[in-house]
Structure formats: structure tokens, C-alpha cells
């Protein structure tokens, strides 16, 4: 049995050496002040290579002025710095691993985080009510065979969070992609024990785990490939809406020529 498991591990490792994994996803948000905007990410990773691009599009003018852009980064094992680039400006620059992995300044306005809270004029300590439906029918979402779940966390009759989630049982290509991404980033940052990967995770499972003493619901097993997160407060229209979905996830033979930028890009110093 041990020999069989070891053989499977060797086959899997050899299999990944000849492949690159591409994942394309989209996040849409409609939040107070900024309004609606969309972020698309496109990442391809192979053994010793990583290329990631991100595009942000906001509908409101002032939000677009602050946020719109299309940027990318490339990591190649054996090089000393990370290549960063701006597709709109057709410019690129080099960034040291020290700056790349530096802890972000959370006090800065240039942080990609969103927070929200429920307003309340009373001192009602009633615990939230958790309900969940679904998980029976198979639905196809971008080629994934999923089961849809709807989880509601109600703080009152007018204040609640609703999660619409499409889960698959397993997503082995995503696990392989995360493993390859972690490996290349660890090589650029060897002094850190573990490298944190950017994850778009705001599923109901987070709230279930954090509030497990208040509910008998268990985290949904598997991997979410699509999530709609809605916050309601004294209105039939959501106060905030966030959507995330994986549009593409596939493996193909490694093409090292993909991990480059156009020759017309101009190098700049970007401190």
C-alpha cells in the first residue's frame, strides 16, 4: 500500500512538471460610496514560473479614476527580482522580494479591503438565526458540476446576510495551482516559513466557523466556484453585494514563452 501511494505521488509530481495551470476569475462588487465595479484576474502558474494579471473596472467616474487599471506580475525561478507591469501605460519595472513581501500598510487608503457593519439604535443581544437550503440538484456553472446552497444569517427581520454558493466536491487543479504558486513564491521569499496566497474567500463557511457556538450548521464541504454575498438592512435592495466566480480552470503543456511581456513596454523606476 505504501509503495502504491508513493507511486501515485511520483506520477502526480511528474505530471505537474509538464503542465501549466490557468485560472481566470471575476469579482463584482456594489458597495456604498464606490458603487459597482468589477475585478478580473488571470493567473497562469507552472513549475518555476508565475504570471498574474488583474483588471479593475469601476462604473462611477471618481471610482474609476481611483481604481481602474490593468496590471500584472511575473516570477521566474532563478531571477533575483519580480517583474511588474502596467498594461495601460505599457511600462514595466523590477521589484525586490523584500518590497514585494513587505507587510502592507493597513493604514493606507490603497488597501484592497472592504468592511461593513450593521447600524443599530437598540441594545438587542438576540443571537443571529442561521438557516440553509439547497444542496440537492446538480447545476452546471462554467462547466463545473455544482450544488447550490443558500445560507441566511438573520440578525433581525430587516438585517441579514445571504450567501448563494455553488460548490463542487473537489477541485484538484486549483490545489495544484496553489501548490505551484506557493512553491515559486517561497523561492523568492525563503526566510518566511509559509507564504500566504491571495484568496477570494468570503463564503458562509467563514462565518459558520467564527460563530460555531451560535449555530448547528456545519461548513459546506468542497470548494466554491461561485458565490453571491448580499447584505440587507431595512430595504428590499441589498446594502452591499459581492459576487465571485471562477470562469476558467484548465491545464495545458508548459509554454515558457508565455511568461514574458511585449518588447514595446518601456522600463521605468517605480519606487
Locations of regions flagged by a protein language model:
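Extended soluble regions of mature proteins
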Residues: 18-271
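Positively charged n-region of N-terminal signal peptides that target proteins for export
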Residues: 1-4, 143
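Sec-dependent N-terminal signal peptides
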Residues: 3-13
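Intrinsically disordered, low-complexity regions enriched for glutamine and histidine
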Residues: 1-2, 15-16, 52
Amino acid at each position: 500500500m505504501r509503495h502504491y501511494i508513493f507511486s501515485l505521488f511520483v506520477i502526480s509530481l511528474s505530471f505537474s512538471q509538464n503542465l501549466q495551470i490557468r485560472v481566470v476569475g471575476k469579482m463584482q462588487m456594489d458597495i456604498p460610496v464606490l458603487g459597482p465595479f468589477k475585478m478580473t484576474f488571470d493567473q497562469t502558474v507552472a513549475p518555476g514560473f508565475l504570471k498574474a494579471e488583474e483588471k479593475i473596472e469601476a462604473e462611477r467616474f471618481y471610482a474609476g479614476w481611483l481604481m481602474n487599471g490593468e496590471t500584472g506580475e511575473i516570477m521566474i525561478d532563478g531571477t533575483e527580482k519580480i517583474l511588474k507591469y502596467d498594461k495601460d501605460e505599457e511600462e514595466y519595472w523590477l521589484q525586490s522580494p523584500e518590497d514585494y513581501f513587505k507587510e502592507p500598510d493597513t493604514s493606507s487608503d490603497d488597501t484592497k479591503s472592504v468592511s461593513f457593519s450593521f447600524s443599530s439604535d437598540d441594545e438587542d443581544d438576540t443571537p443571529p438565526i442561521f438557516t440553509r437550503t439547497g444542496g440537492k440538484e446538480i447545476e452546471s456553472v462554467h462547466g463545473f458540476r455544482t450544488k447550490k446552497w443558500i445560507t441566511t444569517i438573520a440578525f433581525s427581520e430587516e438585517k441579514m446576510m445571504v450567501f448563494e454558493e455553488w460548490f463542487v466536491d473537489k477541485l484538484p487543479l486549483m490545489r495544484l495551482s496553489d501548490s505551484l504558486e506557493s512553491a515559486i513564491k517561497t523561492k523568492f521569499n525563503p526566510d518566511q516559513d509559509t507564504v500566504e496566497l491571495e484568496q477570494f474567500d468570503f463564503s458562509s463557511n467563514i462565518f459558520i466557523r467564527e460563530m460555531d457556538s451560535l449555530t448547528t450548521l456545519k461548513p459546506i464541504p468542497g470548494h466554491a466556484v461561485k458565490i453571491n454575498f448580499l447584505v440587507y438592512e431595512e430595504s428590499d435592495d441589498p446594502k452591499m453585494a459581492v459576487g465571485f466566480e471562477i470562469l476558467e480552470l484548465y491545464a495545458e503543456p508548459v509554454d515558457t514563452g508565455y511568461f514574458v511581456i511585449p518588447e514595446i513596454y518601456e522600463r521605468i523606476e517605480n519606487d
